């Protein structure tokens, strides 16, 4: 999904692409940590890439699955928007395909925020394998902190980009 978002970024808001891609990047950074932290000794790069040595299991959250579904609908709708806009008479009065896609963008933004937060807060999203419960709890807490801090940084960046985009829309002469 993350590969499709930059491809349509010029057809949609950059802040939303940043939010979606940033959530995925936050999860990827945390996955790197989880793998390294939970890998049994000795920790080597060869063992890191040896997936016959499982050390953690990721369980996608329900909201994350809905978010992916909504992202696919958004990408499809955004891609089809030029074609659909030519036939706006198919919609009831005061409703446009652009408005529908805009509304879907906000829904996707909300579910992306919810999804990112769920990985940061839910303890059952990642199960670290092993027998030392105290160590597993510590590694899980650090991994969720990595997701939380990195995703919060992305959210701040997305808000900044949204405000900047809003200023440009209000005043086209505004320099970016």
Spans of model-derived segments:
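Multi-pass membrane catalytic core of lipid/isoprenoid biosynthesis enzymes
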Residues: 1-36
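C-terminal membrane-associated helical module and adjoining short loops/tails
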Residues: 34-176
């Amino acid at each position: 999904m993350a590969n499709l978002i930059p491809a349509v970024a010029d057809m949609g808001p950059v802040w939303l692409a940043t939010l979606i891609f940033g959530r995925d990047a936050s999860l990827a950074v945390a996955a790197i940590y989880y793998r390294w932290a939970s890998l049994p000794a000795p920790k080597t790069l060869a063992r890191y890439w040896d997936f016959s040595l499982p050390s953690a299991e990721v369980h996608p959250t329900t909201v994350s699955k809905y978010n992916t579904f909504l992202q696919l609908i958004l990408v499809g709708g955004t891609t089809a928007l030029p074609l659909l806009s030519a036939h706006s008479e198919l919609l009831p009065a005061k409703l446009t395909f652009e408005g529908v896609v805009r509304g879907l963008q906000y829904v996707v933004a909300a579910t992306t925020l919810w999804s990112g937060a769920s990985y940061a807060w839910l303890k059952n999203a990642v199960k670290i394998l092993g027998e030392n419960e105290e160590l597993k709890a510590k590694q899980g807490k650090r991994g969720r902190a990595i997701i939380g801090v990195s995703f919060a940084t992305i959210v701040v960046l997305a808000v900044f980009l949204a405000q900047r985009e809003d200023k440009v829309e209000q005043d086209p002469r505004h320099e970016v």
